[in-house]
Amino acid sequence: NKHNLTHDEAKDKVYPILRAEEGKLHWYCLDYWQKIFELDIAQLKEDVSHLIQIHPFVLEFLDQAKAHNKRIYLVTNAHRKTIQLKMRVTNLEDYFDDIITSHDYGVAKEDQGFWHKLDESINLDKAKSVFFDDSAHVLKSAKKFGIGTVVAISKPSSKIKTKTIEGFINIETFEQAIPVKPH
C-alpha cells in the first residue's frame, strides 16, 4: 500500500476524483491517472491482462463483416496503451481497417466533436453505419450525430449482469448481430 491508506480511506479519496472526470477524456487516460495517483496504471492493467477476453461470437461477426467487404473500425475511448495491450492479448488487430481512440482527437466519444472528427477522418456513411457500445452516454452521442444503427451491448462482460439500455436495440452477444448464423 504505497499511500498507507485503508481500503475505505482510499475509496473515500479516490471515488470523488474519479467521478469528477467521468465521461471526459481524462477518465480514459492512463497517463492522467498515473500522474494523479502516482501509480503505474499501465503496469496494473498488464498485471490483470489475463482477464481480457474476446466477447462471445465477436470473431464470427468480424469474419462475416470482412467476408462482405465491410469497413470495420474499432472506435474507443480507451487509451492507446490499453488498446495495444488488448490487441496483443486477443490478436484482433488485423480485423480492423483502423483503430481510433478518442485520444487521437482530444475529445471523448460522449462529445459531438469526436464524431465530427471521426467523420472527417474516415468519411462515414452515417446512414449505413452500425455502431456498438455499452455506454448509454456514448450511444446517445452516436445517435445524435446521426449514426444509422446504434446498438447497445447489454452484457459487456461475463463478470457483470445484463443491463438493458433504454431507447436502443440491445444485444448480449454478437451472435444476435450476425446476419447469417454460423453452422
Task: Please report, for each region that a protein language model flagged, where it lies by residue.
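A general structural-boundary detector
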Residues: A20, K45-V48, K70, Y105, ...
